[in-house]
Amino acid sequence: MMTQQIDDPMIPVPIPQQVPAKEGIAKLPGTRLGYWDTGGDGTPVVFLHPASGSALVWLYQQPVFAKAGYRVIAYSRRNYYNSDLAAEDNPGIGSEDLHNLIELLGVARFHAVSSAAGGSVATDYAFSHPERLLSLTVSSNNLAARNGYIAETAAIIRPKETESLPRWYWELGPSYRAANPEGVERWKELNHKSETGKGARQKVANVVTPAKLETLKVPALLMAGAADLATPPSIMRMIARHVPDNEVVVVAECGHSSYWERPEFFNRTVLDFVGRHAN
């Protein structure tokens, strides 16, 4: 297990200038999803956003991964910015929306990089279409575990009262809130812009249990913020017991949004991981 070397947590990281990217609305079976794509001949990296975000939130990652030679793609799931709502009678399966999107974009194999709720979709995809993934990065998510002791423990450490707290309070760690109040406000703006409607909750194709995790065929990077109230390092260590090929990274002085709170470390760690799983 790897732990972040302590950078200075009191120095805010400025948002870098974005590189050109095509923005569009993908017309898929049963829905339309907003996305952006930097294009090019590089290996694709597809970013899957948290429930607090959308395709808009990857400001720290887009130019860094593109300049590292990758084709960078992000999209908004149903119920989020520029995408349709999920219908009550047919909400669809999030991982199949992802599959339909990459088929439309002509992507053969790719690296999936996810945060929080995006990790549930990415993991579901890894079970349904492992042949399409070069690697799987999951930050701040229990890999969609719905049954078994991991899911039960996650429920215990995240009581219902948590939902009454402001989202920014329990998603952003105390070090970040102290060091970067402007970043907190920007995060709030993106959160407000991302959550465009309350459609139905989408379904998953696979029921994830500890036994199911042991069948995962994709190399996995498991990241947890040391101060994450929702998915702390303890949950990631439980998951790591069952995932055959995994690396666990604990991000120091970080809450639930490591891609935003500690972007330089997040980017370095993920770039190193995907670089070692190119084939």
Task: Put a short name on every predicted segment.
Residues 31-84:
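Conserved HGGG/HGGXW glycine-rich cap/lid loop of the alpha/beta-hydrolase fold
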